[in-house]
Amino acid sequence: MKPFTFYDIYYTPLKELDDKHAGKFFRMICDFLDGKQVTIDAENDAEISSEFELYWESISSDLEAYRKSAGKSCGLDKRYKHFPFLPFYQKAFTYLSDSEGGTFVKMIGAYMFENKAPTKADGDAFKYFNICKRKLDESKQRMQNGAKGGRPKKNKNPPQEGHVPEKCDTFARKENGNHS
């Protein structure tokens, strides 16, 4: 497992699918980004709806561009909101069923892109979300700092060498009767 950038274009279809299909969809995203061959055939797979297939086609070209870039910026960062999906989150996801995994990924997406904290719920998805929350908050803080302009720019005009500021002549003022 290696970290990858989670774009809001992945979250959009996930939040529209029911939890079980969202979990399956996200597993396919992870498999695809790990270099595995992913094929979708709605006609022969009863689990996959035409809606599921269309959602996959809507992001497949962006997934391919990201995979070919080997994790480096491929222009998607400038077009879409995003955050790093750490191996820690992926590991938590692998422990969950498709249904719980879908709930988990939806919680993360809602928290990161919509600022919606999940309400207390039964099940492992909520527990795992709470375990991941501290790291998500760190990513959120970096996103907010980046929105403000990120790291401060270096000064383009460095101080000139050999330039000494002139001192005012206090002795001359005292001779003229000005004591202020």
What does each model-found stretch correspond to?
Residues 19-21, 29-85, 98, 110-135:
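Intrinsic disorder/low-complexity detector
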Residues 51-52, 58-78, 128-180:
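Charged low-complexity intrinsically disordered patches
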Residues 1-21, 76-111, 153, 160, ...:
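Append "and, occasionally, other polyanion-binding protein interfaces
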